[in-house]
Amino acid sequence: LLVFYLNSQFVLAQERFEPIKVSEDNFIIDGLLDEEAWQNETLVTIENEISPGNNTAARVETRGLITYTDTHLFIGFHALDNPKNIRASIRPRDNFSLWSDDVVLVRLDPYADGRNNYIIVVNPLGSHFDVRSVNAIEEDDRYDISFNMEFETAGQLVSDGYQVEIKIPFSSLPFPNGKDQLWHFNFFRKYFDNGNEIELSSQTFDRDNSCEVCQTTDQLVLKDIVIEKRFELLPYIAGNFSGKRAQAQAPFDFDKLNPNAGLGVNLDLNKTSTLEITMNPDFSQVEADVTQIDINSSYALEYPERRPFLIEEPMWLILLMVLSILVQSIIP
């Protein structure tokens, strides 16, 4: 009886949202929710304070809006507050110091299975980062920061707070095959009150449940969407040569140019299967524009993994490496 009661509470916590599909011509992503298409769209209120309050009523108003077209999901936020209290700076993408700003956040679980959340975080000026969240025991294992998807954001301060717009192509997200979709999602907001960090959610949050991704359960119904298959061609060409001086004042004597080239292909067979081929991949690629300071460090600097072939599904690569080692051990 107790188990049935708890399950009933879980089911009742779900809400179902069925936004109306609109024309993409009605949207300009400028950070202002002034387009006519937003006026009658599905409203999602962020009314639960989950920290420091424990599912208490939010003390500020936050409106989330959601709609979609054949090929894109559109999300809007209107976060009400005194503009003087809002913290925001223009930051590069995937700069996690963004978390020290006021932010709004959307979690998407396209498979509705509580295994993955695809998260987009945006501050009042439109700066953003994205991350994939999984169910893991250790905090450091819960977030895959190498995950990147295509999307567009914009944000602006307004007289009663700030507004944010997000445009997400369906082609950038994994989800089950089919034109009609049932996803799980929720919205989140973080702001500051007298220096204290306040967190709000569109759903209640169970602190005793260690599975955060399992608590993204509001239902989002999408009908008759267009599934665009992704095709990416990633060629590269590089070369190097070296030289030396025979004597201190002599000119450099250079060797011949050593050219190198390779190709990567990424093709969606359908929404659940992807064919990825690489020939002579450029394993020297790193995100070298990441700012890091090295002063008398006893360890080398590390850069985040950005090579497409290695971040699509790293677990498959680990499995292949393990199988390769086993085969070599069995068949010397």
Predicted ranges, named:
Residues A13-P332:
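Structural preference for beta-rich elements and adjacent junctions enriched in aromatics
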